[in-house]
Amino acid sequence: FWENNIARSREFIDLIFPLLKKYFPAQFRSVQSETIFHEVNFIEPTFIRTESDELTYHYHIMIRYEIEKLLISGDLNVSEVRDYWNDSYKKYLGLEVPNDAKGVLQDVHWSFGGIGYFPTYSLGSFYAAQWYEEINKTQDISEMIRNSRFEEINQWHAKHIHQFGRLKTSDEICQSATNRSLDFGCFERYIRGKFNI
């Protein structure tokens, strides 16, 4: 939520831009806030998941999920993972993986047995878009960001999400916070609105 929906928003970039110019005058002398907004929201396939944009990020997750599912089902051998990975990056992202460091070995998850974790990253983005939409129903979240009213956003999360911890399931929390189960349409609307697609 904070990293993508807030920190990559036009309003947040405009808010911090004077500080960037103040504390890094040489680096930002001839830069406009619009340029920074486009830089942090530029859509381009990358090899590294953690360096990817909000849209193609989910292809990275999908590839890892497919591999894990195939490994668990026995339909993919460990010796075939590299080729499957490389073929998937070509198929989904149009990228030829140059080496394992930018490919199959870039994440630490599998080395410590972290199987099944990757989809939670995408789920987080999907929930965040729904929460953003829900907050925006009663408050102008863009105005809140412009005016540094982050405590109000934190309070909404504390009241509707964080206070429950593991007392409720994700779906129960989503239902109580937004009156519906997880709705991928919220993420789609968020992406379409932000990137004008």
Where are these regions (language model features)?
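Long, amphipathic alpha-helical stalk/connector segments used for oligomerization, subunit docking
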Residues: 4-112
